[in-house]
Amino acid sequence: MIACRMSSQDLSITAKLINGGIAGLVGVTCVFPIDLAKTRLQNQQGKDVYKGMTDCLVKTARAEGFLGMYRGAAVNLTLVTPEKAIKLAANDFLRQLLMQDGTQRNLKMEMLAGCGAGICQVVITCPMEMLKIQLQDAGRLAVCQQASASATPTSRPYSTGSTSTHRRPSATLIAWELLRTQGLSGLYRGLGATLLRDIPFSIIYFPLFANLNQLGVSELTGKASFTHSFVAGCAAGSVSAVAVTPLDVLKTRIQTLKKGLGEDTYRGVTDCARKLWTQEGAAAFMKGAGCRALVIAPLFGIAQGVYFIGIGERILKCFE
């Protein structure tokens, strides 16, 4: 009996990991261009290169082609599987562990489970976003460089070689250089800011989703439909994403290694927040909020839909 239960538990955990991984891959593929626009909008300082999300996507497509809108996607697609798998599986595991009765709603325990999931995921999230941001922002830096060169043709703030570096950065090269010069801590630059963003996000998202999803649970099946889970994931994701946008802006600014001419560098979260407030005003903390909502809503809607359909369970049954 014990062996049988252990086998079933192992199967359940594996299925949850597969569900989280598949959901992450599908979600990232669908919304990555909007995420790229969010990163570029959040990193703008002084004169804006892009007026908004649509303007950013149009200019990116014209200057860098369709594939330019997926710059950095390879990093995300590689690492989003373990990231989303850890996040969703950790929350599910902690909820079952902390809840006294599986059918009883307990907001405090749900928030604590969400907090635990947010902490677990940063092991993957921090280095993934560190590399992704450098690749996503390269196109904006190239535009800034060209504008500076046009304005001051006799004075070149960047060397000719740096142009190609901005346009053709490599995730492998960036990772190797960070490890060589700064060690493992280089890949975990902005870890504190990542925790400050992801823990509140998870505390808001998971309890909100669980309660919204519960509204659509069928008495016959004991589960919500795919459509309801998708809508609940979208709603909870968009609310959570907008709520933590100021922290996401700080994280993006801190993790960006290369800056344009005249752009600030930051020593940490407090220094970044102070400079952002004094030099760009309160509105700067909400840069990319619309993009974040458009990215996170379908990303988590798809994630929860796939998760509750149970694709992982069906895949594992094929190997039984």
Swiss-Prot record:
Subcellular location: Mitochondrion inner membrane
Record GO terms (molecular function): amino acid:proton symporter activity; L-aspartate transmembrane transporter activity; L-glutamate transmembrane transporter activity
Membrane topology, record value: Multi-pass membrane protein
Each Solcar repeat, start to end: 11-97, 105-215, 224-313
Domain of life: Eukaryota
KW Nucleus (keyword) present: no
Sequence intervals crossing the membrane: 17-37, 66-86, 111-131, 190-210, 230-250, 293-313
UniProt-listed Pfam families: Mito_carr (PF00153)
Keyword vocabulary terms for this entry: Membrane, Mitochondrion, Mitochondrion inner membrane, Phosphoprotein, Repeat, Symport, Transmembrane, Transmembrane helix, Transport
Family statement: Belongs to the mitochondrial carrier (TC 2.A.29) family.
Xref: PANTHER family: MITOCHONDRIAL 2-OXODICARBOXYLATE CARRIER 1-RELATED, MITOCHONDRIAL GLUTAMATE CARRIER 2
Function statement: Responsible for the transport of glutamate from the cytosol into the mitochondrial matrix with the concomitant import of a proton (symport system).
UniProt name for this protein: Mitochondrial glutamate carrier 2
Organism of origin: Rattus norvegicus
Gene from which this protein is expressed: Slc25a18
